[in-house]
């Protein structure tokens, strides 16, 4: 009867989303039997697909668009497991598993646009709050980095760690004072 050992491999979200290799060489107590792997073409797993050739060479392709995969942070992992079978061609078979470790990476948080308006001579200070930030990494909590009086082209912005801000228009600038009605 044939025998075959278990195997392991890994992929990494966003960077190395496929892996290829060769499964352990099977053995058989019947020395005259030729043992081969039963092929699998695009076998679906929980997080990707597995393809296996009769010679034991395989490819795993991670579904990198999966929200669960994208939800992984640094040092977080998932596993996808596939069972493979070898045959001696005379009715004897043996099975084992390929365990794929999916490693997470740090995904960039994002925040949507925020709009506000100031008006020359009348509304020169604007207080507001930025849009709520999001992060695809499930366990990461994005925060704002406080900035004190960042000077822009026409005024200054103070951003607090809670996402609230104050924008102060430099109303004394010639460019600001030169604005016409509705500009």
What residue ranges belong to the model's regions?
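Extracellular interdomain linker/stem segments of modular secreted and single-pass surface proteins
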Residues: 1, 101-108
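Extracellular ectodomain surface segments
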Residues: 2-45, 94, 110-151
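Acidic, turn/loop-rich segments in luminal/extracellular domains of secretory-pathway
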Residues: 43-104, 149-183
């Amino acid at each position: 009867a044939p025998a075959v050992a278990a195997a392991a491999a890994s992929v990494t979200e966003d960077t190395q989303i496929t892996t290829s290799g060769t499964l352990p060489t099977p053995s058989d107590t019947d020395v005259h039997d030729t043992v081969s792997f039963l092929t699998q073409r695009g076998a679906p797993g929980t997080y990707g697909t597995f393809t296996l050739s009769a010679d034991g060479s395989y490819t795993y392709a991670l579904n990198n668009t999966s929200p669960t995969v994208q939800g992984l942070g640094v040092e977080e992992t998932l596993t996808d497991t596939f069972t493979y079978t070898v045959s001696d061609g005379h009715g004897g078979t043996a099975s084992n598993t390929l365990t794929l470790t999916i490693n997470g990476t740090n995904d960039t948080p994002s925040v949507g646009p925020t709009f506000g308006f100031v008006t020359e001579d009348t509304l020169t200070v604007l207080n507001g709050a930025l849009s709520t930030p999001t992060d695809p990494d499930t366990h990461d909590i994005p925060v704002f980095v406080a900035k004190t009086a960042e000077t822009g082209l026409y005024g200054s912005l103070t951003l607090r760690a809670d996402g609230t801000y104050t924008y102060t228009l430099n109303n004394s600038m010639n460019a600001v004072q030169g604005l016409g009605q509705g500009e």
